[in-house]
């Protein structure tokens, strides 16, 4: 994002070209468009897909909104459509599955308030802006209300159980996992 802000501040064509290339790479190469990880992104090490980390935050629409709104690129619109409901991938790919016992959970998955839920919000906000579909606005509001119920609200800690179908969050304490 910092490259886009640098371009907006400077108007420098070189910075635009660099930010555009990074956005295109990240949206096309680092995001799964088919298969069991569709809607997720993969960090990469020395070679692409070298990391077992498959997460929504790597694919989130927020990384590419500047390019979309500056150019109207239809391909990015297609990618945003792929991502707008990617919370459902959390049913199969719980980002905190290695840290919590499934049998003790109330909701079927987890979402950290920072890297997971905020990434989903980025997708929902983009879907709401582009299509004025109130469902995406409601998903954001549901999560905000749930976070407000945590003892210290947003600063309570990052770990929440998450229901991808209702988009509700359930605070589970300050375990600092993930």
Where are these predicted regions, by residue range?
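Glycan-recognition and catalytic cores of secretory/periplasmic carbohydrate-active enzymes
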Residues: 1-178
């Amino acid at each position: 994002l910092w490259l886009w802000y640098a371009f907006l501040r400077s108007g420098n064509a070189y910075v635009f070209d660099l930010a555009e290339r990074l956005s295109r790479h990240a949206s096309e190469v680092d995001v799964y468009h088919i298969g069991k990880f569709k809607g997720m992104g993969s960090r990469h090490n020395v070679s692409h897909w070298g990391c077992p980390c498959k997460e929504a935050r790597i694919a989130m629409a927020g990384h590419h909104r500047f390019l979309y709104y500056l150019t109207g690129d239809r391909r990015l619109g297609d990618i945003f459509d792929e991502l707008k409901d990617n919370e459902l991938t959390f049913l199969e790919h719980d980002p905190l599955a290695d840290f919590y016992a499934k049998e003790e959970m109330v909701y079927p998955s987890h979402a950290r308030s920072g890297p997971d839920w905020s990434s989903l919000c980025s997708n929902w906000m983009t879907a709401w802006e582009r299509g004025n579909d109130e469902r995406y606005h409601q998903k954001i509001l549901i999560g905000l209300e749930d976070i407000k119920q945590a003892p210290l609200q947003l600063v309570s800690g990052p770990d929440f159980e998450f229901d991808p179908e209702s988009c509700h969050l359930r605070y589970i304490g300050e375990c600092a996992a993930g």
